[in-house]
Amino acid sequence: MNAEPERKFGVVVVGVGRAGSVRMRDLRNPHPSSAFLNLIGFVSRRELGSIDGVQQISLEDALSSQEVEVAYICSESSSHEDYIRQFLNAGKHVLVEYPMTLSLAAAQELWELAEQKGKVLHEEHVELLMEEFAFLKKEVVGKDLLKGSLLFTAGPLEEERFGFPAFSGISRLTWLVSLFGELSLVSATLEERKEDQYMKMTVCLETEKKSPLSWIEEKGPGLKRNRYLSFHFKSGSLENVPNVGVNKNIFLKDQNIFVQKLLGQFSEKELAAEKKRILHCLGLAEEIQKYCCSRK
């Protein structure tokens, strides 16, 4: 990225929760990728007026403004699909926090729309930019997996806003697919105690070489945000990830990737591989949801 960009893309941030606030901070700070972007305002359902000197603007103004060329969608997952469609139809590039949609068909349709409009549609995956993932990637390369498991625990999450657990937890599924290739669903169960705000989803997957992988999402009051993993290879085992350092500026690293796409610096092959992985994960998440719901 050149230090002095020839032009800046006008950006609006939709949703100013945790992710949206980090995005606004990165856009305002002097980073190489931020030099290509100009934060014009933010959209929120709440009446906030301004945040740190950045003005709130209406959704209608964001869609119709010639100044706005890019939308960062940082709202709850249930609203992503509608926002993406509106901004693509208005001729804007879109960066969206994962999951981009809560169904495979919607994601495919939106990707087709982005291609028709000649716009970038980028789904954030900061989990692939974490130090832990870089460590795992090095550890598993060239090894034959015998079996593996990944358990994620956290506090409760509202399904109405963030989607079925296979969608809200899609970053864990993305880790497994990125490490071991495309996966197929063997079975899935969902245990829920709504009165206790507790849920546990257990998914049995297998690799193309038929090695079993289990993925568990467990959420409830008092559960700390944690990841436990165990991978057994022909050449040894990996039990959990050592402390590999702090994840610095992962949203900024994701923004760098997005700007490279805006500038046409990604090859068609790289873009196609990323799209294939994202759609594979969304398709698996949908399959898991259908499997669990059919057994209720």
Swiss-Prot record:
Zn(2+) binds at H280, C281, C292, C293. InterPro entries: Biliverdin_Rdtase_A (IPR017094), Biliverdin_Rdtase_cat (IPR015249), Gfo/Idh/MocA-like_OxRdtase_N (IPR000683), Gfo/Idh/MocA_Oxidoreductases (IPR051450), NAD(P)-bd_dom_sf (IPR036291). Belongs to the Gfo/Idh/MocA family. Biliverdin reductase subfamily. It is found in: Cytoplasm, Cytosol. Disulfide bonds: none annotated. The gene is BLVRA. Pathway: Porphyrin-containing compound metabolism; protoheme degradation. It comes from the Eukaryota. Liver. It catalyses: (4Z,15Z)-bilirubin IXalpha + NAD(+) = biliverdin IXalpha + NADH + H(+); (4Z,15Z)-bilirubin IXalpha + NADP(+) = biliverdin IXalpha + NADPH + H(+). The keyword Oxidoreductase applies. Its main location: cytoplasm. Its EC number is 1.3.1.24. Keywords: Acetylation, Cytoplasm, Metal-binding, NAD, NADP, Oxidoreductase, Phosphoprotein, Zinc. Reduces the gamma-methene bridge of the open tetrapyrrole, biliverdin IXalpha, to bilirubin with the concomitant oxidation of a NADH or NADPH cofactor. Does not reduce bilirubin IXbeta. Uses the reactants NADH or NADPH depending on the pH; NADH is used at the acidic pH range (6-6.9) and NADPH at the alkaline range (8.5-8.7). NADPH, however, is the probable reactant in biological systems. This is Biliverdin reductase A. The modification Phosphothreonine is found at T174. Monomer.
